[in-house]
């Protein structure tokens, strides 16, 4: 890993411009199945080139601890990419496409404001117990900054990842006498709703037997000033006006969506919707809008999948706290 970090630093000092048709590295020196797959796929080559350019632009404007952090994180990401996608049972190319999309988006988010010191950690394993073949590939964030105490939020993400890994590993009572294929994949994206807060959106999908798999998106708003996870009640002004407004906006939008895909009518009842909208995991605060994500079974059947409601910040401006984590510029 040390040699890779040094290579990245050297590249920042004077790498030639990336080839316009190939990836950011020399395909003649491709040393593993992941790199060879990238070299053979023009779409992946472009994804690698774009990601590398985004990384180089970010690292080039950083210095000191921030630059050290992003260089080490990039080296770690490349190593995790090789291990995770190299062992992916669904194929290397699909794994790479997802990883590159998320990494490029996160690097752009890191560049949008003060560097947030967020590194990507991973848990990965594959094996077999009885007749069950299983694998998991889990990415989760760690806040490495020193401006606040991030101990609690880091433990929260790490513990959730460890629990997911344990749940994705078959046990003796898991029906090991039947042929099964268990998988679990998890990644995350970072959004910047303001200069002093980030949203971490964790996406996961798994299958461990049964009629179908399971998946969801869970969002966490982190106030970088305090190092704490905060909920909608911390972003909106005090009182219940924000909740009443959200119930009206979300209820009206869902009613329209239910025309095209089935939903639970009882979910639209104000009391039920209010209870759901108090839960912070649905609130994916982004750069210019709030995205409400309601996962399968929460307001509709599994076949309908998740429901999403976008709310521009202009509609919420009177309700947002001036000193809150999502304060808008005047």
Give short role names for the model-derived ranges.
Residues 14-19:
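N-terminal signal peptide c-region/cleavage motif recognized by signal peptidases
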Residues 31-48, 53-60, 83-330:
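Compositionally biased intrinsically disordered regions enriched in Thr/Gly
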Residues 44-48, 66-73:
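Short amphipathic alpha-helical heptad-repeat segments
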Residues 68-86:
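Histidine-centered, metal-coordinating catalytic motifs and their short helical/loop contexts
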Residues 28, 40, 66:
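Generic anion/oxyanion-binding catalytic loop in active/binding sites
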Residues 22-34:
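Secreted, propeptide-processed cysteine-rich mini-domains
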Residues 3-13:
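Sec-dependent N-terminal signal peptides
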């Amino acid at each position: 890993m040390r040699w890779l970090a040094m290579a990245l630093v050297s590249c920042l000092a004077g790498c030639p411009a990336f080839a316009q048709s190939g990836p950011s590295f020399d395909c003649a020196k491709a040393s593993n199945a992941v790199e060879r797959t990238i070299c053979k796929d023009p779409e992946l080559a472009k994804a690698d080139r774009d990601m590398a350019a985004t990384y180089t632009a970010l690292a080039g404007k950083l210095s000191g601890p921030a630059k050290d952090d992003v260089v080490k994180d990039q080296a770690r990401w490349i190593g995790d990419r090789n291990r995770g996608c190299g062992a992916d049972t669904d194929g290397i190319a699909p794994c790479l496409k997802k990883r590159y999309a998320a990494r490029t988006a996160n690097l752009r988010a890191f560049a949008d404001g003060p560097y947030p010191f967020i590194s990507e950690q991973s848990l990965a394993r594959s094996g077999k117990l009885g007749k069950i073949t299983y694998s998991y590939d889990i990415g989760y964030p760690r806040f490495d900054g020193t401006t606040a105490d991030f101990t609690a939020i880091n433990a929260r993400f790490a513990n959730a990842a460890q629990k997911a890994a344990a749940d994705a590993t078959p046990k003796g009572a898991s029906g090991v006498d039947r042929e099964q294929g268990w998988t679990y994949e998890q990644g995350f994206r970072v959004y910047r709703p303001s200069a002093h807060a980030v949203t971490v959106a964790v996406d996961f999908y798994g299958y461990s037997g049964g009629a179908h798999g399971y998946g969801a998106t869970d969002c966490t708003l982190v106030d970088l000033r305090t190092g704490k996870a905060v909920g909608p009640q911390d972003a909106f002004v005090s009182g219940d006006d924000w909740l009443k407004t959200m119930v009206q906006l979300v209820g009206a939008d869902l009613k329209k969506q239910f025309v095209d895909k089935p939903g639970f009518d009882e979910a639209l009842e104000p009391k039920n919707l209010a209870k759901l909208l108090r839960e912070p995991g649905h609130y994916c605060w982004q750069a210019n809008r709030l995205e409400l994500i309601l996962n399968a079974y929460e307001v509709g059947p599994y076949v309908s999948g998740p429901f999403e409601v976008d709310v521009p910040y202009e509609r919420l401006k009177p309700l947002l706290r001036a000193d809150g984590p999502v304060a808008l510029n005047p």
